[in-house]
């Protein structure tokens, strides 16, 4: 495919991705509210539509951005989290405080602290992949099978669950 960089089409893809992503989240919130109010069928329709919107968002994201290896994706995610906690939420909190919304500013600062933890976690996971340490540790740790729950204390996770 032709390079999209600098095109209105790329801008449109990113706008479509953002819109579909926001719609998906909004519909899941609406589904929760409908279910709490006793409207299970309406809740299910919101959830079904949210799943559709997720697929639409993925289509636009793949065209606009692509999906790399897990290590590349972790580093990309870390960069996004870094921007959120170092720039975005800091600036938004400042604006909220200046406009007389200290409670919103405090919430944004609280979320910024969480985003910093997200960045650190993603960078550590990427380093584990790079160093070949995803399934091994320097000391014994608890490994648990994600299928059956079998637990093993060892330095390395087993290739296959012994159960």
Question: What is each PLM-predicted segment?
Answer:
Residues 1-163:
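Non-heme di-metal
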